[in-house]
Amino acid sequence: MSLNLDKITPELIEKTIREKNIKFIRYLYIDLDNVIRGRVSTAKNIDTDLRGGLTLAMIMQSGFSITDLAVSGTIYGPRGEVTLIPDISTFKVLPYVDATAAMIVEQYVGDKPHEVDPRPKLRGYLKNLGYEFKIGIEPEFYILKKSPRGVIEPYERHLCFSTEGMNA
């Protein structure tokens, strides 16, 4: 079954989950360093997740560095949580992971978009220019092979965007 993204509804998502035997949903967001991050929830929680979102500690936006500790008086101090609100138009059954689907989420603090979430900012910029916001995540992928010993390894050992790869 192919989803019509112009007509996707929570009911259609729930039906797809049942028909495709989806067990897990990945809720994905892009951080300020353009790294895909996310949370995983069981598919049985889809109704609750779509109605109320999921929570994430605000400190998770700090960069995951030991030097980025929760310090009072900063945006990442003990302020609570952001709410991840799923964008149902981005629902996709993942063909490369068994029984798993994914959706992009937007981050909210209370009822306002979180100031470090790039999606609402881009949507606003595009609206000011007269454009419509339609964007997804660029997935990274790897080509692998099985070695003679049966070990899965990279097909190519050269680094991407490195001059070393140009000498192959």
Can you say where each PLM-predicted feature lies in the sequence?
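Glycine-rich, acidic/polar active-site loops that bind/position phosphate-bearing ligands
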Residues: 2-168
